[in-house]
């Protein structure tokens, strides 16, 4: 089993931390192999940001994501930039408040994409009180929608990765993201 995951958005959304959490969840807590890479523009906030994670039950011979099984798009620009790379039959998770969904309906149908809506920024604000944890809302949605890492592993990785004193809010955001999928944000 090899799963390629790309999480993309813009600087300031916590895309890189989301990738780190996912990689740690797989490798440290689920006993899988994982490689995480990242890229971002020169801007501190607002520029393009991308984290990629390869998860496998075997040693990973090539660490780059070429055709992701899972794409998490936290901005419309990220969606437009990376959606064509998504494997046919893959999984697409978007923040519907940040993308123009009617522009991708044909793509989703033609490529037989499993499509999930996770209004991460709004959910972070409404359920946790701060938008900065929108990335953990997306990790919760990703975990629930795909099962690529276990809930326990994701929670442990979050606790191990976020700044001290913010663990509870980040776990709340993670749970809120899971609930979005359980409640049928499809």
Curated annotation (Swiss-Prot):
Gene3D superfamilies: Pyruvate-ferredoxin oxidoreductase, PFOR, domain III. Keywords: Oxidoreductase. Pfam families: POR. It catalyses: 2 oxidized [2Fe-2S]-[ferredoxin] + 2-oxoglutarate + CoA = succinyl-CoA + 2 reduced [2Fe-2S]-[ferredoxin] + CO2 + H(+). InterPro entries: 2-oxoglutarate_synth_KorC, PorC_KorC, Pyrv/ketoisovalerate_OxRed_cat, Pyrv_flavodox_OxRed_cen. Optimum temperature is 70 degrees Celsius. The keyword Oxidoreductase applies. This is 2-oxoglutarate synthase subunit KorC. One of its GO terms (molecular function) is 2-oxoglutarate synthase activity. The gene is korC. It comes from the Archaea. The lineage of its organism: Archaea, Methanobacteriati, Methanobacteriota, Methanomada group, Methanobacteria. The keyword Oxidoreductase applies. Heterotetramer of the KorA, KorB, KorC and KorD subunits.
């Amino acid at each position: 089993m090899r799963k390629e995951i790309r999480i993309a958005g813009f600087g300031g959304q916590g895309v890189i931390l989301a990738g780190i959490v996912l990689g740690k969840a797989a490798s440290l807590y689920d006993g899988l192999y994982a490689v995480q890479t990242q890229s971002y523009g020169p801007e501190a906030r607002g520029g393009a940001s991308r984290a990629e994670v390869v998860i496998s039950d075997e040693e990973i011979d090539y660490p780059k994501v070429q055709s992701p099984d899972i794409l998490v798009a936290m901005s419309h620009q990220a969606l437009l930039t990376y959606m064509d790379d998504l494997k046919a039959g893959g999984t697409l998770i978007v923040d519907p408040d940040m993308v123009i969904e009617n522009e991708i309906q044909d793509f989703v149908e033609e490529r037989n994409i499993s499509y999930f809506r996770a209004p991460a920024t709004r959910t972070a604000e409404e359920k946790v009180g701060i938008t900065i944890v929108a990335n953990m809302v997306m990790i919760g949605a990703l975990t629930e929608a795909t099962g690529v890492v276990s809930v326990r592993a994701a929670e442990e990785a979050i606790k191990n990765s976020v700044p001290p004193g913010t663990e509870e809010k980040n776990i709340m955001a993670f749970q809120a993201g899971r609930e979005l999928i359980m409640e049928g944000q499809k």
